Structure formats: C-alpha cells, structure tokens
C-alpha cells in the first residue's frame, strides 16, 4: 500500500448474512447534541464478531487524528449486541450513535439519516472499514463527489436496478440506460451537501426493500445515476480516490 494514499479500505462487505438481533445502541447523554457544523462524518457500521468490532473504532480514530473536533455520527446497521462496547462508546467526543430501524439496509442508511437530521451542511459518508490516513479537503467537494468511482459496467444488475429505478420514478431510468454518461459509486460512499441530498429524496422510496447484498450492490449504480441526474458536471471531478479497480490492493471480500 502506498503511503501517499489518504484513505484505506480494509474490506468491502462481509459475506455472512446480517444477524436478525437488533442491538440497543444509544448515545450517552453528554454526546446527544453538538452544534451545527459545516462538515461532519457519517460511519455506517455492522459489528458481527470480535474482528469486525474493531473496524468502526479504528475508523473513528483515523478521523479524530486528522479532524479533532469535527462531529461524527455512527449509524448502527443490525450489529450483534454481544460485541458492542458501550463503555468505549460513552468515552468518545463529538460523536453520536443512531440505531437504524432498517436492518441490513447497508450504506444507504448514512444518507437517510443525514437527510432526516441535517447534523451538518456536508457529510462524508463511509463504511466502518475505511480508515483515513492523510488530511483531505472534503470542503472542496461540492455538491457531491464519490470516494471511489466504478468505471466498469460489468457488475450492473440490469434487471433489479431497472426495477428499483422504476419504483423511485422520475427520469432516472433513461440516464441509467445511457451507460457512457455516468459511473458507479463504490460502496455508495461519497461527500455530499445536505442541500443536494434533498433533491435525491425519492431514493428512499425503496429503502425498505434493501435487505440483501444484491440490493446493496445495486445501490452503487442507483445512487450514482441520481447524482449524475442532478449534477451532470460530476463527471469532470468524479471522486476523491479514483477508480476502485485501480486502487492498490487495499480492499477485498472478507
């Protein structure tokens, strides 16, 4: 791994099915509110065992080291309660925890709760397995920029993605079919302004249907198409880190 890489991706998606047990994660009283800020981070986590229990905290630490006072919101997506360290969570600063009511919905949850709560003006939405290694000027990423882009269309799930886009409505489907005009968003991770996300509110018409790895993968294209629809110039400055398939050996299935 090159030391010049400002972000590291430890893993993409755990192969195991998410547990049906819902944790009781709550934000300690001294962490429930922070003042509105121009920038914040949203980490979507899913703890399944001792190993994955370390990911979100390492991600939190990597942010804190470079952005000491920036607010962080951690969205818990159906973690196994046996591996949640409530004492550790109570010691974190400028940090809130949100328990999702949509189990196994995955990355889209970061946007759903950011749209709903507007904790800050701009959010960096990442997985719990992304670790920031160097300072990035995320404030310059407006109104939206992917963390990694997907250049290939070889992973497109045309049948299911078409079905979901039809349920969302609008004119997104015609853009989806014009493959040269958009790129995928790896892991549905992006830097996004709240005002811009408001334009994409129809995306959450299908949030209750995102319950499998296949559905979550489809959102890499659906989210991207909606971003391009509302901001066609995205193609000129697409992502922070470039094409994920050219990224040096920092990711894989675990």
Name these PLM-found stretches.
Residues 6-254:
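ER/Golgi luminal nucleotide-sugar-dependent glycosyltransferases, focusing on the catalytic module
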């Amino acid at each position: 791994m090159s030391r010049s890489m400002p972000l590291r991706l430890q893993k993409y998606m755990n192969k195991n099915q998410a547990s049906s047990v819902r944790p009781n994660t709550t934000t300690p009283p001294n962490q429930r509110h922070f003042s509105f800020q121009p920038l914040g981070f949203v980490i979507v986590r899913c703890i399944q065992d001792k190993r994955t229990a370390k990911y979100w905290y390492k991600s939190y630490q990597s942010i804190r080291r470079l952005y000491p006072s920036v607010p962080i919101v951690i969205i818990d997506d159906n973690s196994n309660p046996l591996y949640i360290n409530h004492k550790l969570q109570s010691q974190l600063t400028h940090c809130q925890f949100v328990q999702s009511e949509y189990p196994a919905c995955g990355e889209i949850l970061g946007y759903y709760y950011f749209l709903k709560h507007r904790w800050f003006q701009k959010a960096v939405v990442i997985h719990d397995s992304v670790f920031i290694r160097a300072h990035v000027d995320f404030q310059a990423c407006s109104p939206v920029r992917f963390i990694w882009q997907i250049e290939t269309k070889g992973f497109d799930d045309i049948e299911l993605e078409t079905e979901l886009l039809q349920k969302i409505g609008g004119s997104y489907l015609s853009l989806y079919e014009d493959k040269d005009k958009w790129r995928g968003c790896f892991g549905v991770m992006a830097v996004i302004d709240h005002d811009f996300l408001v334009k994409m509110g129809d995306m959450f018409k299908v949030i209750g249907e995102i319950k499998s790895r296949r559905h979550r993968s489809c959102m890499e294209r659906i989210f991207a198409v909606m971003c391009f629809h509302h901001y066609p110039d995205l193609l000129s400055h697409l992502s922070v880190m470039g094409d994920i398939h050219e990224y040096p050996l920092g990711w894989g299935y675990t």
